Amino acid sequence: MKTFTPKPADLTHDWYIIDAKDVVLGRLSVAAANLLRGKNKPSFAPHADSGNYVIIINADKIALTGDKMDKELYSHSGRPGGLRRDSYAELLKNKPERIIMHAVKGMLPKNKLAKVQLTRLRVFAGEEHPHVGQNPQVYEIEQISQQAK
């Protein structure tokens, strides 16, 4: 039996929407990374771009476990003295999208295909998003934070 290799014409990019309210950051990131890579499809191949578009809403209501609120997210501009350190509590208040983008980026493979797949991730702080016309399918994450109960 021959191995099936998906052709670019066979690949479709579906739209999914995930509500991040009271969902733990790691579980949300795993689900988003798997959808972005297309691992939910039977035609998945690690070298082919079979991923989906993922919309994450309510990024400002995400749950962080442990002492992550005190930890810092580091980024560097590449210039001397360009190190930025922002605490998760500060980012959750000002730019909650950056927390999710950073977590999902870390769960994608480190290659050129991941850059393309990451462009299909759309993160919004509130419930409003401009992608209603794409009719995204709702993707449920069963486990929510224990702190929300």
Swiss-Prot record:
Superkingdom, natural source: Bacteria
Any one GO MF annotation of this record: structural constituent of ribosome
Keywords assigned by UniProt, alphabetized: Ribonucleoprotein, Ribosomal protein
Ribosomal protein among keywords: yes
GO cellular component: cytosolic large ribosomal subunit
Family: Belongs to the universal ribosomal protein uL13 family.
Subunit structure: Part of the 50S ribosomal subunit.
HAMAP family noted in UniProt: Ribosomal_uL13
PANTHER family in UniProt: LARGE RIBOSOMAL SUBUNIT PROTEIN UL13M, RIBOSOMAL PROTEIN L13
The protein's name in its UniProt record: Large ribosomal subunit protein uL13
Organism: Bifidobacterium animalis subsp. lactis (strain AD011)
